[in-house]
Each structure stands twice: as C-alpha cells, then as structure tokens.
C-alpha cells in the first residue's frame, strides 16, 4: 500500500526497530493516511484523495 499524502507528499519514514537485546531490524513508519472525498469547487464534483491527518487538521482539505 502506498502511504503517500496527495496534498503534502509526506511518505513513509525508515529506520531500525531495536529490541531489548539491541538486535536491530529494519522497519518503516507510515503516515496516518485517510481516504477523503474532497469538493473541488462549490457545487462541483467530488474527488477522492489520500490525505494525511496533519493536512486534515491544518484545514488544507475541504471535505464534502
């Protein structure tokens, strides 16, 4: 699944998961991406986008 925000372009972050014995394994942190129906203009068509919750909280998307 491609966890990329259509508004800001935020994608997954990569790093290591470190256990108690300090064994390191690769992992990724995906942004919280939600499917949103967005109104392109008043009275216009709705468009389905994948948007991160930080963009929704910032008001960059008008849901409809």
UniProtKB/Swiss-Prot annotation:
- Reading the lineage from the top rank, the first entry is Bacteria
Which protein family is it in? Belongs to the bacterial ribosomal protein bL28 family.
Query: What's a single GO MF annotation on this record?
Result: structural constituent of ribosome
Q: What is this protein called?
A: Large ribosomal subunit protein bL28
UniProt record, GO biological process? translation
Is Mitochondrion found in the keyword set? no
Gene Ontology cellular-component terms listed: ribonucleoprotein complex; ribosome
Keywords annotated in UniProt? Ribonucleoprotein, Ribosomal protein
Query: Which InterPro entries does the entry link to?
Result: Bacterial_rp_bL28 (IPR050096), Ribosomal_bL28 (IPR026569), Ribosomal_bL28/bL31-like_sf (IPR034704), Ribosomal_bL28_bact-type (IPR001383), Ribosomal_bL28_sf (IPR037147)
